[in-house]
Design a protein with these regions (language model features):
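N-terminal acidic leader/helix
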Residues: 1-30, 43, 50
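Short, charge-rich amphipathic alpha-helical segments embedded
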Residues: 28, 33-38
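Short, charged early-sequence alpha-helical segments and their helix-coil boundaries
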Residues: 36-52
Length: 52
């Protein structure tokens, strides 16, 4: 799951893409598929991606 989300983050081109990534991250955490630490790390990475 972690790798799938990282790939989604790498593909961010718009704010909608970023929102979709945030949703995926939250859902994976709620389903206990990623840890809290991974949740925070992925949120940080998604927030760093610049969009046009």
């Amino acid at each position: 799951m972690f790798k799938k989300i990282v790939k989604s983050i790498a593909a961010i081109k718009t704010e909608n893409d970023r929102d979709e990534c945030y949703w995926q991250i939250d859902r994976a955490f709620e389903e206990e598929r990623i840890s809290y630490e991974d949740h925070e790390l992925l949120y940080g990475l998604a927030g760093m991606v610049e969009v046009a």
